[in-house]
Every structure is written in structure tokens, then in C-alpha cells.
Amino acid sequence: QQSSTDPVHAFPENLRWTVGAGPGAVVFVTINLPGSHNGRDSGAALTQHNPAREAANAHWLRQAFAHARAVSASGVVIAAHANPGFEADSGLFGSVRTPRRTPEDAYYDLRRLLAELATQWPGEVLFLHGDTHRFQSNQPLRDAAGAPVKNFTRVESYGWPVTSSWVRIDVSPGHTPLFGIVKRQATPG
């Protein structure tokens, strides 16, 4: 299903589909999330577009989690381009901090929304992204008290110049963890 949060479908990147049924179902969601400071450094025309895009993304994510509940899914997979700055409040590169907004943090609201949705969701959440070109798999989100959100996993795929490696994601309904993450090395042909 494509997002219909606006009359002219200004955000065709926002898609959703479901694989499976009942407790084995997984809901897949894509959102329009550009890198480079969430598109805020892209010139006046694109910068004016950002509030509407960010609102559409938030609405679309809320709808996706509501849909996941309605179909009794076990997991939600969210795919986007940008690394939404998980490191800013995860403690991955320093001490764990309570998340707080700073003027230069273009992704703060998205991370808070993801933490809210994940903590209210009984299943697993997998966030897939690229952007910073290095493999990462961790649980970077923190709740409002600074505690890890344990059912939220982020996987960042390899990017240039690491073009000989890839990531395999296995989905195992009825098992814990629901998502298996395996790094792979391409074999020379």
C-alpha cells in the first residue's frame, strides 16, 4: 500500500506491505528519509518541503504500527536511506545519555517517535538503513529515561568502498529473535 496521507501522493517512497498472516506476519514499511542532515542542507526549495515530509513520515509510521497490531504481526521492518543519527543519544560513541533535542539534530523527532512506537509494540522492530557506508547492527535507541529499547534493532548495510560484503536478514516467525542478521563476504567469481 502506498501512503495516502496527502491528496497528491507527494511522498511515493512511503510504502507498506505485509508478508504472512497472524502471529507470523511481518509488516514492511519504507519512509522518505534523506541523508545529509535530513535534507535540511539541500537548498531553500527542498528545505521548505521538509516539515510536510517529516509529518507524512510520522503519520505513516503510526499507521504502520496500527496496521501491525490489527493483523497481529510479530515484527515491523522499517527501511530508509539515512542513518538518523542513532549515535546522538545511544551512547555508542560515548556514555549513555538521556536523549535531548539540539538545534543541529535533524533526526531527533524521528528517533523519539521510533522509541515511542517500539516501546508500545510487543513485537520486534528492525530498522534498515544505509547512508554512512559501514556495517552496524545494534540496539541504539534509548527511551525517555535513557534505557535501551530492547525490541528495536538497527542494521546499517555496507556501502562504498566496501562493495564485496553484504548482509543477509533471516525472518523466523515463531522464534526469538525474529530477525537473524548475518554478515556475508562475496566470493570472487
Per-region residue spans from a language model:
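Extended active-site neighborhood of metal-dependent phosphoesterases/phosphodiesterases
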Residues: 1-56, 60, 137, 141-172
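His/acidic metal-ligating clusters that form di-metal
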Residues: 27-29, 44-141
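Short, surface-exposed linear patches
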Residues: 43-44, 99-100, 106, 148-152, ...
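A short, acidic, flexible beta-alpha connecting loop/helix-capping segment that sits on the rim
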Residues: 79, 159-162, 186-188
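A short C-terminal boundary segment appended to hydrolase-like catalytic domains
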Residues: 172-189
